[in-house]
Amino acid sequence: MELNEFVEKFAEQFDDTDPSEIKADTRFRDLDEWSSLVGLSVIAMVDEEFDVLLKGEDMRQANTPEELYNIIKSKM
């Protein structure tokens, strides 16, 4: 999966945020809708799409979808 595809799938985890607002360099924690529940949805999506198990620490290390994508790629 390429970065753009990942960003689209990442953006789909937000119910009330327009997906076009989320880019590879968006600081997702700054989004009003960001919560631990969205974080869990992202972890589940990554497990399903990439077969990679993210930990809470991985989520804390990433500030943007691109940083998270790079963490996932390093675990593949």
Regions found by a protein language model. Name each.
Residues M1-W34, V38-I43, E48-M76:
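Phosphopantetheine-dependent thiolation modules in NRPS/PKS and related acyl-activating systems
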